[in-house]
Amino acid sequence: HSFIRAAVAIVVGAAPLAAQQQTARPQGQRPQRLRQVVKMDSARAEELYVSNRAEDQPPADFERQIEQKKQTDSILAARAPGAYEFKKITYKSNVDGLEIPGYLFAPLNKRGAHGHAAMVWVHGGVHGDWTQSMLPFVKEAVERGYVIVTPDYRGSTGHGAAFYNAIDYGGKELDDVLTAVDYLKSLSYVDPDRIGIMGWSHGGFITAHLAMRKETPFKAAAAIVPVTNLVFRLSYKGPGYQRSYSTQPGIAGLPFEKPDEYIKRSPLYHVEDLNIPILVHVATNDQDVNYVEDQQLVWKLRALKPDLAETKVYVDPAPWGASVGHAFSRRVDPKTLERVDSPAQIDSWNRTWVFFEWILRPYEDRSKPAPKVATGPGQ
């Protein structure tokens, strides 16, 4: 196991002026590396401890997570009548057969074969799950004609310890989400040629990754306030955040130990492979995925993929929650589950719906023959 520990005294290679003025060394003798001692408070040193050993990590309350998941199930089911079809689903990940739970939301009045556009909607994390907080936006998607699948990929909460500890950030979780496409294609009323993907934060990270694969089944993607660069991210996040990555079996190390692994798992380094339209919205006052990280993706997309990328930077949008601008477009009253709109939230969602409608055409019922278009007199 490897670790980093900030000691009470940190030794750094430096040569003070006084040391440089010492007596000249004998010819042929290598210069000594002089040391300078920098004192550090012991309490601060304790805070800077980082370990990638699983036994050093704080335990999760799995019973509480499972209970919260049951409450989410109940709320989503209770609000479904007259609004949307709701179903708890499972499917096997195509990478290793792991059972992936999720939700299906669909219009009550189904069209015929291939009648509906569809989307895979990816929740955030690091450890997280699909909750009722996104319900008003999902309802609007269904009203617009979309069929929605929301996978709880490996590492999600509410499904027990083994599933939680199977987290593989930027690894097998991508395949878990990708396999949701196969589930959608198994539904006769879903058009396999009109499937999109979107997500926020960690969900935006997964969305961007899958959009930037050389071969992707998605026709369009929206990544909002996405994690983009794990190498850089771990340089400005604290030890607790670093532990959550470095302890994962698929990573098992910090960026300085496994730089290639972190690069492989960072969407920023795969922009060149993007070949579908993508929408990216970020906020300058984001206190989770800080703008200093997201601006790298925005600039690179604008430089390399201007014909495929639609990007917008929201300058200090109305805050929501502890992460300030991170949830600027997910402002929902936790009690009523109604939108708490701000100008930025309204603008972001309007742009998102127009983006997807331009590409996926959710209002088109392709189970019916396309109407004939007159080409001239008598036609």
Which stretches of residues belong to each language-model region?
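Acidic beta-to-alpha connecting loop that harbors the catalytic carboxylate
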Residues: 125, 284-286, 317-318
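Short beta-strand/loop motif that positions the catalytic acidic residue
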Residues: 274, 280-282, 286
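Cap/lid segment of the alpha/beta-hydrolase catalytic domain
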Residues: 78-101, 105-193, 198-201, 235, ...
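Non-catalytic accessory segments flanking enzyme active sites
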Residues: 25-108
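Conserved alpha/beta-hydrolase "acid-adjacent" motif
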Residues: 287-296
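Primarily recognizes the serine-hydrolase "nucleophile elbow" in alpha/beta-hydrolase
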Residues: 180-236, 373
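C-terminal catalytic histidine-bearing segment of alpha/beta-hydrolase fold enzymes
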Residues: 295, 306-379
